[in-house]
Amino acid sequence: MLENIDTSLIDWSRAQFALTAIYHWIFVPLTLGLAVIMGIMETVYYRTGDKFWKHTAKFWMKLFGINFAIGVATGLILEFEFGTNWSNYSWFVGDIFGAPLAIEGILAFFMEATFIAVMFFGWDKVSKRFHLASTWLTGLGATISAWWILVANAWMQNPVGMEFNPDTARNEMVDFWAVATSPMAVNKFFHSVLSGWVLAAVFVVGVSCWYLWKNREKKFALASIKIAAWVGLCAAVLSAWTGDGSGYQVAQKQPMKLAAMEGYYQGQEGAGLVAFGILNPDKKTADDGKDAFLFRMEIPKFLSLLAERDSKAFVPGINDLLKGGYPLKDGTTALSAQEKIEKGKTAIGAFSAYRAAKAAGNDAEAQVAAKVLKENVAYFGYGYIKDVNELVPNVPLTFYMFRVMVILGGYFILFFIVVLVLAYKKDLSQMRWMHWVAMLTIPLGYLAGQAGWVVAECGRQPWAIQDMLPTSAAISKLDVGSVQTTFFIFLVLFTVMLIAEVGIMLKAIRKGPEKEPSHQS
């Protein structure tokens, strides 16, 4: 059946999922970060009783609510697409992938839904303590939601805690905690959530600088800037640290992705990390003999240090990963891509033989087939690969997006330091150049987050589940025209929703925060 699937169906299914995910991630990080910033502001109000902080928190809550509503809508569509466009994937790993999503829906979403109502409508109706708890629990619910979604995504990057059941043709969970607490999941969670805090901090600083540029709400703007910049600086530094941890996990579990991130074709000991480079557009395949770069600047030995925590360690490149033959940590020798493909075909053949023997009631043949399947099941997904070059992701896209993310991450650290120095040491309200810098930094926060996800998802192609299920085998057998139609429907729908959100937010920003009374209470 899979041989008859039109490649354009694969491309359009991927495009539709990417479209939904990109739009969804426009809203999620701002929700995660604003929850922390407005929680801190309300905590100050609770401790001081100064209603200025109450009105400050309420203003950012209003923007949080607008953003939260659109994020939920896009998230629901994203989850439904697993069943509509990726039914083979859903069947193959539904027992594992469904568990985190179910927990996210039952626990996190209902926590958010319960306490967000108190947060918005409970002012002066419940005690200040309970309202503060509701605000923080709303943010906690959003963060828990992110945890389980990212656990599911991390499992796709590094499938653990499961085994293949040939009787059901499914991968089934055998160790929930291995799935929930894998190092890949932990690093991905902290890196993604902290990047959301950075984006929200950039957003708050940028909006507040707009007020200063307009010579409005000076007290409100400066107070918001100071809190947001501290949150942003801490998050940006920690995000860089967790990014290092994520890089190490990628090197261990997805070496081809790491090689694509670096445009790294020929492995070596003491490998350097490319700080900046221009790829050779004429290089099309790993073995075409052409140089990978037109120009590059390297940090010596840094890639080995990142990937193996040893500046002298060998790091395999794309050619090494395709040809194999290099020593592994366990003392064995790496298989070539072609050898993995042959083992994958053996696994698929053994699975078919097992099902046929079971259907015929031949237990002896079934046991033999099951043994062969168990020996080769780790390479099951490779059996669907037709050419070794399919195992190489889009190198230019992965390489450049990785550098966009890293460069912007460094810029944000510098940005928050400058903002804090000016806010505490100078009169930031008079520095119109800084107002423009802050406002123009807002879209860069969104760009950094999207670039990170492009690296994570495009860098792991051709796999829907690393080494187990290629994207080409994960899709539903649909009519290409129907996928194209829904793609453009979603494109229009999401664009309208985005325009509506931006319009409502701009209206709320132009209106500004409520005026606090002149006295404290």
Language-model features: where?
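Polytopic transmembrane helical bundles with strong interfacial aromatic enrichment
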Residues: 1-521
